[in-house]
């Protein structure tokens, strides 16, 4: 069954947790959400020169990432959720190293992979999501579109989480995942058009 398009960002996140929290640590390790004042104080502390999109504020008002001592927790398929301090500190380190462009703020990570949101100087409701690894590229239209796509992957069985030896593993139907992500993110069609030869005979399911 497809997910409900009218869900709020927080409702989407809670529904994703219904799948990934088969690992008891997931809910236990989520940090309490931040107030708007706390969010703004952290932004100022790190001299972050951009305005956080509304959907990022909603994300961190929901929960402030996972506790720092446990990176095995998955908010969704194999990626963990950075605290706002971690996100801003990582952004600062990236700028010092010249690793990525300045207007990308990391939110989710796994072993050198990063999902980053594009930010602007002025307040925006949303921002496009970039995948940063060996190559950088836009992969989701917005944070909400990304999370909604992930939720629907769980809802239709394209992602099937399994708890094994105390860890969550996910069985993936790559064709279904590619179909769902393309349905809700127009930017993925642009990527497909650009790299048609690369994806020939394959499924654009990741990232």
Please report, for each region that a protein language model flagged, where it lies by residue.
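A surface-exposed partner-binding patch
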Residues: 1-115, 186-207
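Long, low-complexity, intrinsically disordered segments enriched in glycines and aromatic residues
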Residues: 63-182
């Amino acid at each position: 069954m497809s997910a409900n398009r009218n869900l709020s960002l927080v409702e989407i996140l809670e529904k994703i947790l219904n799948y990934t929290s088969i690992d008891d640590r997931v809910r236990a390790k989520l940090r309490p959400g931040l107030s708007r004042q706390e969010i703004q104080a952290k932004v100022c502390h790190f001299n972050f020169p951009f305005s956080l999109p509304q959907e990022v504020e909603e994300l961190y008002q929901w929960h402030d990432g996972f506790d720092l001592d446990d990176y095995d927790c998955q908010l969704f398929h194999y990626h963990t959720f950075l605290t706002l301090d971690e996100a801003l500190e990582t952004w600062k380190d990236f700028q010092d190293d010249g690793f990525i462009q300045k207007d990308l703020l990391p939110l989710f990570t796994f072993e050198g992979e990063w999902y980053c949101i594009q930010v602007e100087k002025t307040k925006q409701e949303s921002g496009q999501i970039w995948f940063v690894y060996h190559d950088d590229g836009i992969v989701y239209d917005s944070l909400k579109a990304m999370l909604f796509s992930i939720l629907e992957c769980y809802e239709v069985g394209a992602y099937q989480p399994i708890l094994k030896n105390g860890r969550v593993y996910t069985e993936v139907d790559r064709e279904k995942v590619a179909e769902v992500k393309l349905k809700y993110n127009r930017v993925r069609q642009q990527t497909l058009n650009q790299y048609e030869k690369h994806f020939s005979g394959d499924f654009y399911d990741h990232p």
